[in-house]
């Protein structure tokens, strides 16, 4: 059965159930009819030691959320920092961050000392991702990942893998998959970790025996710091520094995609250099040039 045929039948089934007064799909696992479901289940069983019954049970009642596909298909938005910052630097957010820092001062200091990640960076991530926990998302994570894993062809395998990780996590921690909520793309908790990253980089920083990024700000602080440390964060190294440009075409050096940094040596030949001579940077260091002001 082709994927398009699957969704036609899925839609017809939804309409039929609604006609009988059922506002939501009630089959044990409607996604089991998708052509790739069997392979997904087999992969989940092999990767995490789950049984077929465990996978099917965790998927029971999963709902298709077609609006998520529409969100994913929207064109990406690229703004310079001076335009983008207004989304995050509202007075209410700043005050929420001040209160969060005061409340978790000891934990933030402990994480900085242990992992070498400055408190400001940890706070910045928490502020951007969830407004310091005030908005962790409202989509049922299982439903979001299933919708994307079986309906978003560009990254279907990635989201199926994350769905399998979610199911494994739910059994490991005794959490019902239907109770986990997060972003439309499946990210969870204060730091918006994808499910597969929770066992990889999550830290039980409050020492209660569980990694709980949904409810424990302390675990979230330690996990963010650990994540950055595991990804090569360099203690006491500069994060950013003012640069001087002596070339004639600034558009050629300003980063268009922050995921594609350039070696400093290349940018140096194009006229970029630190304004402060104390800053030491190697030609092989990967950097981005960003414009902070108009």
Where does each model-flagged region fall?
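Functionally critical loop-and-helix segments that line ligand-binding/catalytic clefts
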Residues: 192
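Cell-wall glycan-active module
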Residues: 1-160, 165-181, 186, 196-294
